[in-house]
Amino acid sequence: MKQSCVAILSACALFTGASAFAPAAPSVVSQTQLQMGFFDNLFGGATSADITETVYFDVTSGGEPLGRIEMGLYGDVVPKTVANFKALCTGEKGYGYKGSVFHRIIPGFMCQGGDFTNFKVMSAGKLSWCIIVISILENYYVAEWHDACAVGTGGKSIYGRTFPDENFDIKHGGAGTLSMANAGPNTNGSQFFICTADTPWLDGKHTVFGKVTKGLDIVRKMESLGSQSGATRTEVKISTSGTV
């Protein structure tokens, strides 16, 4: 099964010219698992740390201003991850988050963004060649269809296309938690997500590097524009970004 999946992925990537291992949305678990405390104390550690840097996003919805989100970053705990995110906020390397979109928003879960390389080529209501992304979640293979050139399949770090997981010292501490999206171990790039609920099952899989310090109400407004599939009802864009 695994060999077949890899073969399909390789063929699709070669055919479309797209990456078959683009960052996918963090996995969702059932409310039953949460209510039973299935993930309680699975990973020890703090849910926050000292803030060393503060950055911001000015967000629009359908071209209209939605508000500003400020995020405090944990530079003492994950300096490499923080340096990457900060540089992409300022655009000091010649590329970054300004003008990119939150391409996947799932109410009661998270808002994901950070693909600033492929977001411009997506055309609403129009399908092109598709690829299959196989995510290995525990012992299950989950197939997702993605537009071959669509938002959510790109991005890059300041260190190259990807960089390793720095550590998992900070746990996902509920709404406002800022964490790296990935396509598996050691595949961090530029994509990230802001949690809108408790997500303890992500501990040990995604690197937490900050939290929302101002504008959680703006995150809630963004959340209301999403859907269970992750598709947004209107374009949610980072119009500007930088340091505070």
PLM regions and their residue ranges:
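Cyclophilin-like peptidyl-prolyl cis-trans isomerases
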Residues: C5-I8, F15-V244
